[in-house]
Amino acid sequence: MVLMRGQQRFRVLTAGETAMARRLFGDAIDYPAVRIFNRRYLPFGLQPKNCAMTPNGAMYFHHSCCLRDFSTGSEHARHWFMHEMVHVWQHQLGYPVRTRGALRIGLSYRYQLGMDKTLSDYNMEAQGDLLADYFVLKHLQAASAMRQPRYANDLPLFEQVLSSFLTHPGERKNLPKGIVRRLR
């Protein structure tokens, strides 16, 4: 694990990180606009070391876990990066990530796959884990890195639930339902 240098406050995505994210999001993200900060977002130590935050289209990792290139990190690091990229995607499509994150009541990271569900049926944190789990299962064949390994043998079910997203990742209809979506 190679960490970012202490004096480097932020960086852009590496070529490897961009390639990794493109496998899931295609052209739905403005990749050059994404920044990864080598510091907490919240002041006064309110953001735990092992907690990244992506409230505004940029990622904020504690310096002890901010890698120089997440695409060369462990499978768990790549899962974490992809979870945070989901929040970048949500933000860039107009979802109020910062506002919804501040009102975390009821935001479980857990998801339950079902043939009758689509990605928009899940809250913003569940979307993060669902898409990151799908990514590590489909592209890394790393079920051990999944947050919900009970779905390790359910790739067809993931693809059913994600069918609209996989076909059109840039459409706002894939964002979480149940909250007013910010207009651009």
Model-derived features with residue positions:
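Short, solvent-exposed loop/turn segments at secondary-structure junctions
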Residues: 39-43, 59, 65-67, 86, ...
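Short pre-active-site segment immediately N-terminal to the catalytic Zn-binding motif
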Residues: 27, 46-49, 60-82, 118-120
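Metalloprotease/metallohydrolase-associated module, dominated by Zn2+-dependent proteases
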Residues: 2-5, 11-23, 28-29, 35, ...
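Short, charged N-terminal helix-start/capping segments
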Residues: 1, 54-63
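Charged, often glycine-rich, active-site loop that binds/positions anionic groups
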Residues: 41-57
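Residues in flexible loops and secondary-structure boundaries
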Residues: 42-45, 67-69, 143, 174
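Active-site recognition of the HExxH zinc-binding catalytic motif
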Residues: 79-91
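Short histidine/acidic/glycine/proline-rich micro-motifs that form metal-
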Residues: 7-8, 67
